[in-house]
Amino acid sequence: MTDTQTQKEAVCTAIDDHRDDIIELAKAVEEEPELGYKEHATTDKVTAAFETMGLEIERDLAITGARASTDLETSADEFTIAVLGELDALVNWEHPKADPETGACHACGHHAQLANLIGTAYGLSSTGILDRLHGTVEFIAVPAEEYLDLEYRRSLVNDGKIEFLGGKQELIKRGYFDHVDCAAMIHADADTPEREILTRSSTNGFIGKFVTYRGRSSHAGAAPEEGVNALNAAMLGMNAVHAQRETFADEENVRVHPILTKGGEGVNVVPADVRMESYTRAKSIQAVNGANDSVNRALESGAMAVGADISIEDYPGYLPFQTDKTMIEIYETNAVDELGSDAIDTHNPHTTGSTDMGDITQIIPGIHPMIGGFEGTPHTPEFQAVDDEMAYIIPAKLTACMIVDLLANSKTKEKIRQQKEQKYSPEDYLTLIREMRRSVTGEYLSD
């Protein structure tokens, strides 16, 4: 038996020894869900687990994030892999575990990500293997992946507390990935109660937008001709967006899905202040930017048609995610050993949702396998873990074993570093997403 195989067996045994602790943490997080940049209690739970392992801990990363390692002063020469877990919940008031005051719930499985994070840390730290690996592992609890509660996040931007609405973007900006060579995390798969893993995938990127149409109020029954109907402007704008859809190439997987968040003040008043939010999604950065230009032009046409004013505030959403082939092949080998080849799906579908793990994979290689053990579709009331072993324990074993294999092989580490060189530098990445932050205005309201 090789030293690497012996280490992996020790890691898996250690994770089994801490099985109850890992599952207890996941369920405690699930019972106390918190929204992005507000995850104080969740971070307390995660860092308390890190403390039991004797790891160095840094808190208050991008407000609520945290990281831990045996040595947080890693040199740039040391090969570093980051294991990530997301802290935040989403809002679904119908979910059975939704917070009655905020609607927050873990209907996207982030509590399972934290189990993977903590479980991997237990496996590598309690065995002492972290100190013997040829490289460094950082465990990072990341805030604010779900792109919601946006008025609160915009207030943080306006107060200078953050620049970006997404947690990983903010951590990149603050330099926490400058020295990291690659990253790994997991995600709950949809409607997969079986012990199966979809290992490879890609996702859309997107730009988020806030739109305000301003018209002129008037009595809707007695004098509508004296008003300028901002709701009509918004409806025309959305219809103009729909007229653009045939121009979007099928292979770019463009998605545009606006909602009205304010339609007026009252039925008997011509709407003068109408608000909209939307995403423009696509498979490539170029397609996101191109489709977004078309969407903004269409939205402005609605204001022009009725003589209303419009303001559009574009914010960088998330960039497209790509699975790293070198890392995922190591992960798959360990997954086959644990679950058998029939349980591993490698067909690499493209999904049209988005994640800020995409931003990470634009600057360093990364993986984001989709884990079984869950019923229901993420973000719905039906979503729940139904197999504790698959949802919380097995992923930690696979992540930890992949790390042991990866750090034991100097050629693999060199290959990953070469792949990192082909990606955006953090500086170029920040330039790219800052260019997505734009304001568009159109003034058509007459005096």
Describe these PLM feature segments.
Residues 3-107, 111-138, 143-144:
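Acidic/His- and Gly-rich active-site-bordering loop/insert found
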Residues 30-32, 106, 110-113, 185-187, ...:
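Histidine-centered active-site/metal-ligand motif
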Residues 79-82, 136-138, 181-184, 366-369:
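Structural motif
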Residues 92-105, 111, 118, 127-257, ...:
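Histidine/acidic-residue-rich, glycine-tolerant segments that coordinate divalent metal ions
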Residues 77, 83-97, 202-214, 369-378:
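Acidic-glycine-rich active-site phosphate/pyrophosphate-binding loop
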Residues 2-3, 232-447:
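Metal-dependent amide/peptide-bond hydrolase catalytic core
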Residues 29, 83, 110, 139, ...:
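Divalent metal-coordination and catalytic microenvironments
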